[in-house]
Amino acid sequence: MDNKILESIKSILSTNKKIILIPHSSPDADALGSCLALFHFLKNDHSVSIISPNEFTEILKFLPGSENVIVYESQKDKSDVLFDEAEIIFTLDFNSLGRAKNVSYKISKSSAKVIMIDHHENPDDYADFMISNSKMSSTSEMIYDFIAYIDSNKIDNNIATCLYTGIVADTGSFRFPSTTSRTLLVGSKLIDHGVDVTHIFEKLHNNFQFDRLKLLGTTINNFKRIDDLPVLYTLITDEDQKSSNFKKGDSEGFVNFGLSVEGILCSVLFIEKKEDELIKISFRSKGDFKVNIFASRYFNGGGHIHAAGGISKLNLIDTEEKFINDIKQYLKEYYD
């Protein structure tokens, strides 16, 4: 992290401020964990609010302070007042205003100082202070460094729990290539603050309702392979969602199952979103297979080398056909 930027932010935070913390739309554990950790760190000296563009999964409601999150979609009037009064806005775990969806306009029009802290590639230039490092395992690891620089003595169990959750989620429990020796060191330091590692694992992974278990079975059964390419993909249709009483977060982690097959380098999940008239796409990979480039080029998306997302405005059948053609072309261009 740039010490000059950190010193400037530290100076701004030396007096009481009205602060908003914003995760990306449909926040995951890293985004929400980062926001909640910073919320706990700042709340005693500042007026702090977390505004999420939309609702987050029930799975993450075990995180300390999650009940304080304001959801813009359902609490617009309250949120608008906070935006009007804000002096500082932190955008966490995203580097393009489009990732904030319905809140992006409020950020761009605000007179508040905007501070970006994020670990994705190719950040947009929208923030007054930009802390960006795509080599970091997670935004939560970056927030640990940020808090430790400002005042490490304030790190308590609540902060540690939120950060540890974000780190283990984004590193696949410390198994993804983004995990470094320093990531493990930060995890160790957080455990020293009383983090209940077993409790977090249980909440993140052993949380299936019976309907979700059946949906997983359907998703696995739907996996297809394209010829002899090292690619698997699967679909969750609107009908699948209705029959399983689908809730936000129910498909979390499903795409990873494709990578457990020997010889497979890329796994893709298509989720039909009829209400939004689009297909949500999750890409995962390993080795040299760069799904962020593929997602950006063909499906208006992006992300990390081994984890990315995208969307399609075509119907599910046409999206599947487009994907098959595109992935063949991509592999021919980049890997032949």
Where do the language-model regions lie?
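A generic local secondary-structure boundary/capping motif
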Residues: 78-80, 103-106, 130-132, 152-154, ...
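Short alpha-helices
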Residues: 117-186
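Short acidic, glycine/serine/threonine-rich loops at helix termini
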Residues: 33, 62-64, 103, 126-129, ...
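Active-site cofactor/cluster-binding pocket
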Residues: 70-129
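Glycine-rich, phosphate-binding/catalytic loops in enzymes
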Residues: 38-39, 106-109, 132-133, 185
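Hydrophobic helix-and-loop "lid/oligomerization" segment in the mid-to-C-terminal part
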Residues: 2-25, 31-73, 77-88, 169-336
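Short, motif-level signal for alpha-helix interfacial/capping segments enriched in acidic residues
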Residues: 3-8, 95-97, 147-150
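Solvent-exposed alpha-helices and their adjacent loops that cap or buttress functional pockets
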Residues: 81-83, 106-109, 123-124, 154-157, ...
